[in-house]
């Protein structure tokens, strides 16, 4: 995720997720955050060919929304692409990331329409694992004010079970460790207070994208 390294969309989005929090504590995080944000905005894939790529794009859009970027048009484009290409995507963690972004934009109806189904992380592959998907999706829904939705509570429970099982086994990948730590910063999973969690930029969408 560094300027001189090969660009990895998922890892870059995860780094930006952490930088958003780091900026609250240290203004020196602003420059790397701005550089990474610009790169992610330019590179987000709105026409993914696999559900794993779609999940990465959805997570990226959630993190960009959380950071303060207006993403309404991209959310609409990605949602349309997934609807036409991936049957049952509404149960994937990708739907949770889109719901979180819509909620942060105060598009509540769109957000809640995407957390009606019981989530499943079984399809997670590529850069993802089921455990990583559950941890980051639970974190996103919690931070977006959807933590009391049944889908979010299911993901929180799943993430907690994954965490206990994985650490008991003693084998933890760096990416999963980062995702699990990210989840631990949210109120429902444990970490930040509700007030601290609410300190992120609050965007309001005033005009929907055409189409």
Positions of predicted regions on the chain:
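Large, well-folded core regions of big proteins
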Residues: 1-211
């Amino acid at each position: 995720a560094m300027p001189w390294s090969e660009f990895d969309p998922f890892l870059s989005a995860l780094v930006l997720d952490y930088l958003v929090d780091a900026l609250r504590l240290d203004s020196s995080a602003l420059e790397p955050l701005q550089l990474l944000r610009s790169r992610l905005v330019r590179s987000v894939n709105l026409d993914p060919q696999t559900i794993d790529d779609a999940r990465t794009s959805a997570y990226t859009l959630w993190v960009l929304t959380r950071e303060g970027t207006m993403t309404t048009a991209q959310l609409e484009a990605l949602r349309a692409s997934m609807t036409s290409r991936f049957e049952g995507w509404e149960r994937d963690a990708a739907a949770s990331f889109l719901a979180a972004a819509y909620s942060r934009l105060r598009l509540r109806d769109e957000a809640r329409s995407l957390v009606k189904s019981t989530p499943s992380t079984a399809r997670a592959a590529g850069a993802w694992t089921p455990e990583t998907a559950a941890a980051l999706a639970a974190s996103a829904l919690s931070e977006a004010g959807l933590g009391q939705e049944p889908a979010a509570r299911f993901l929180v429970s799943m993430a907690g079970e994954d965490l206990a099982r994985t650490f008991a086994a003693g084998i933890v990948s760096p990416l999963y460790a980062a995702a699990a730590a990210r989840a631990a910063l949210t109120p429902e999973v444990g970490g930040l207070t509700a007030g601290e969690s609410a300190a992120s930029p609050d965007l309001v969408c005033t005009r929907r994208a055409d189409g």
